[in-house]
Design a protein with these regions (language model features):
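Catalytic beta-strand-to-alpha-helix segment of the class III nucleotidyl cyclase homology domain
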Residues: 69-181
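C-terminal tail/extension regions appended to the core domain(s) of diverse proteins
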Residues: 169-204
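A generic fold-level signal
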Residues: 4-6, 57, 114-116, 139, ...
Length: 204
């Protein structure tokens, strides 16, 4: 292990909801399911550009980060670009979902139930330890743990953008968002103030 550095970062996870139910047992349907999920994951990744970077793929999710300090970009640019991308993830996801629905290859369970898939995105701002293991760049630390814990929450809908107060204050969105303030609590991490945006409630 070498090249250990701590950076202030925006941490983001884009996670496909309905993935477990979608990956059904029939062999043909499993293959079609994986193809569909892969297409949707690739769609999200195609939206990623510097200052956002992909840390890793985590099954049905993409773990992203943006360093808050940069020799190339101003902080104002980073926070605005991140806000634009957080919204664009939903637009791109649903455009791809519509395309797959329109051109679905068959009537199997996977192809017939595309409407059950949705996207949830969680975001937190904090610190992360960057280190290398062989050729792999890893991130760790309390804030990395927290952003993953946020995927398990009390929100009663499948599609949303959940931000901690730190992320909400750091990110600047292109339009006014209707958000709901909430509270989550996690063992060893304590209470977390959150702001939740549901895509259909966008103002502007």
């Amino acid at each position: 292990m070498s090249n250990q550095d701590i950076h202030e970062v925006l941490l983001i996870i884009a996670d496909i909801s309905g993935y477990t139910k979608f990956m059904v047992s029939d062999d043909v349907e499993v293959k079609h399911s994986q193809h569909i999920i892969s297409e949707l994951i690739h769609t999200i990744i195609r939206q990623v550009e510097i200052p956002l970077e992909v840390s890793k793929l985590e099954g049905d999710a993409v773990f992203l980060y943006a360093k808050k300090e940069s020799d190339t970009f101003t902080w104002d640019y980073i926070r605005k670009t991140t806000g634009e991308k957080l919204i664009r993830f939903f637009d791109a996801f649903h455009n791809k979902l519509q395309e797959l629905t329109t051109h679905r290859s068959c009537g199997c369970g996977a192809c017939s139930n595309l409407h059950e898939l949705s996207l949830k995105v969680v975001a937190h701002s904090g610190e992360a330890l960057f280190y290398n293991i062989h050729d792999f760049k890893e991130l760790s630390g309390k804030d990395v743990i927290l952003v993953h814990r946020l995927l398990k929450n009390s929100i009663n809908t499948d599609e949303y953008l959940l931000m901690t107060q730190q992320a909400y204050e750091d990110v600047e969105f292109p339009d006014l968002l209707a958000t709901e303030e909430g509270k989550e609590s996690y063992s060893h991490l304590g209470p977390v103030t959150t702001y939740v945006y549901k895509p259909e409630s966008r103002l502007g």
